[in-house]
């Protein structure tokens, strides 16, 4: 029997928790949809090497480890009819050697255009 690949650890920054709490008021299924995204899309991308063109590494940062990624294809059931093009964005750090991801930021593209680079730099530089 084969086991399903997962990450050894999934952590959340306090700022991420605040983002999630705020967005969860508008998008009721967000917590559950986030868990599904981590178990499927992120595991496929990092653990099994399958790219669905929904996860992109953020470039132009002054460090390489951890690698910082943005998820653009994020299906949210609360946004009916939009599928993976919901407009939600997830920023996370991937610590390859530790088999760990750390959730940095989540936002709705209609509210904010790009990731908070200052947050990324203050936590990982």
Residue ranges, per PLM feature:
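Enriched for short, Lys/Arg-rich terminal
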Residues: 2-7, 75-125
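Residue-level signal for alpha-helical context at structural boundaries
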Residues: 34-41, 52, 56, 109
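Arg/Lys-rich, positively charged N-terminal/basic patches that mediate binding to nucleic acids
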Residues: 1-45
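A short, surface-exposed loop/turn module that caps and links secondary-structure elements
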Residues: 43-80
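A broad, low-specificity signal marking well-ordered, structured residues that form hydrophobic/aromatic
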Residues: 10, 68-69, 101
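Short alpha-helix boundary/capping elements
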Residues: 42, 46, 96-99
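Amphipathic alpha-helical interface surfaces
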Residues: 12, 30, 34, 67, ...
């Amino acid at each position: 029997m084969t086991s399903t690949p997962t990450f050894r650890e999934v952590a959340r920054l306090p700022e991420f928790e605040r983002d999630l709490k705020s967005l969860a008021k508008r998008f009721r299924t967000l917590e559950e949809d986030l868990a599904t995204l981590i178990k499927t899309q992120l595991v496929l991308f990092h653990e099994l090497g399958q790219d669905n063109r929904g996860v992109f590494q953020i470039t132009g940062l002054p460090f390489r480890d951890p690698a910082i990624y943005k998820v653009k294809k994020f299906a949210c059931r609360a946004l009916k009819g939009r599928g993976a093009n919901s407009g939600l964005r997830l920023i996370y750090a991937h610590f390859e050697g530790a088999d760990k991801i750390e959730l940095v930021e989540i936002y709705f593209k209609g509210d904010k255009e790009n990731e908070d680079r200052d947050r990324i730099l203050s936590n990982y530089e």
